[in-house]
Amino acid sequence: MSRRAKLILATLTFLFYCHMALAQNKYDAFTVKVSGKGQPVILIPGATCSGAEWDETIAHWNGKYQTHAITIAGYAGTAPMAGGPYLDKVRTQIEQYIADNKLKDVILVGHSIGGFLALSIGMDMNSSLSRIVVVDAMPFFAGANNPNAADTFSETQAKGMLDRYIKMDDQQLKASQMMITKFMCLDSSRWDMIATWGQQSDKRTMAYTMCEMLGKDIRKDIARIKVPVLVLAAYSAMPQYPQFTRESVAKTFGDQYKACTECTVHVADGKTRHFIMYDNPLWFYKEMDTFLQKNN
């Protein structure tokens, strides 16, 4: 090989790796695992959770879709973002990811904070989307039980939450996450995995993403969504809260989503808490598959 050819090859190799490095650095708000072929589905997990939350869902589809399983930066042991506003960065970078990869007729599936993000993306990108599935999330969670909840991010609240996390060692944080997990998921075989994701998450990211979601009211803004949206709401009777009924859940979610003419709310028929895909997978898959097949 001539000296000139070697120089050209070396230059092209250098440019290739520069391009790869830039592509990887472009999306510092999340990591993504892509598998399968077909219509693209972007899956966004709940707070502190890994994209592996969707492993069984992806396996259920058995290659029918091209799945893009997101893990938000800072969750479940991944490197955190340099700073906030965290959820705005995640939203804008997922939108950029859709545009950069020329994804069309995208199905968005989001759980918890991921559902809030899916709604936010749906407000911006109707032309690129086909359907949205929201798993136990609301456009203004803080306002569900508090009509006076403020539509503003509270730095004081976020710092207070972060301070509580910082004071915990790993064992204490794991115990705290386990307590929360046991309340949010009935499937005991999942408890350690979910609590470990929380323990491994960046404490600042945990505090600020949660407070950013709690401090943002998009109940009116979801009227801008022009693609069909299926909202799946969890319900499991709790004797200590007799006023908490399936009917009360349906009313709360209905009130939250009343501005969205494209939104349909379905409430689980019992023994299903926040991690619907784990507690009631048969109902979850049936509801989602029926909804997505209407797209064909």
Where are these regions (language model features)?
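Catalytic histidine-centered segment of alpha/beta-hydrolase-like enzymes
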Residues: A268, T272-P281, Y285
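Conserved HGGG/HGGXW glycine-rich cap/lid loop of the alpha/beta-hydrolase fold
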Residues: V34-P80
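Conserved hydrolase catalytic core segment
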Residues: L103-N146
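Flexible "cap/lid" loop of the alpha/beta hydrolase fold
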Residues: I132-M168
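Bacterial Sec-dependent N-terminal signal peptides
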Residues: M1-Y27, V229, N295
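Active-site loop/oxyanion-hole signature of alpha/beta-hydrolase fold enzymes
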Residues: A69-V109, I113
